[in-house]
Curated annotation (Swiss-Prot):
It is found in: Cell membrane. This is Cobalt transport protein CbiN. InterPro entries: CbiN. Keywords: Cell membrane, Cobalamin biosynthesis, Cobalt, Cobalt transport, Ion transport, Membrane, Transmembrane, Transmembrane helix, Transport. GO terms for molecular function: cobalt ion transmembrane transporter activity. The chain crosses the membrane at residues 6-26, 68-88. It is a multi-pass membrane protein. Forms an energy-coupling factor (ECF) transporter complex composed of an ATP-binding protein (A component, CbiO), a transmembrane protein (T component, CbiQ) and 2 possible substrate-capture proteins (S components, CbiM and CbiN) of unknown stoichimetry. Pathway: Cofactor biosynthesis; adenosylcobalamin biosynthesis. Belongs to the CbiN family. The keyword Cell membrane applies. GO terms for biological process: cobalamin biosynthetic process. Pfam families: CbiN.
């Protein structure tokens, strides 16, 4: 039972690595731009005189700080999801133990 779980985890890990690496080989000379840049380009093609009606509340000082904030946001989100999944798994384990004692 445990060997099957380990094998499944290894296969899933290899699949994640494969899915992560394959785009670099498929699009060797591809330009990895952000969606904001693509949207701005599409809007200026439609209307060159377009002025945004909204401005950001906070503008980071540099691209590096913007990347840091984005990575921090992703890490916090992953932590919240991991905590939630761990909590649910622990809750299920406790419920299973309680149910086993009552049988």
């Amino acid at each position: 039972m445990k060997n099957k779980r380990v094998l499944t985890n290894v296969i899933l890990l290899l699949l994640v690595v494969f899915i992560t690496i394959i785009p670099f080989f498929v699009a060797k000379n591809g330009e990895f731009g952000g969606s904001d840049d693509q949207a701005e380009e599409a809007i200026t093609q439609i209307d060159e005189n377009y002025e945004p009606w909204f401005s950001p509340l906070f503008e980071p000082a540099s691209g590096e700080i913007e990347s840091l904030l984005f990575a921090l946001q992703a890490a916090i989100g992953a932590g919240v999801i991991g905590f939630g999944l761990g909590y649910l798994k622990g809750k299920k384990k406790v419920n299973d133990e309680v149910n086993d004692k009552h049988r």
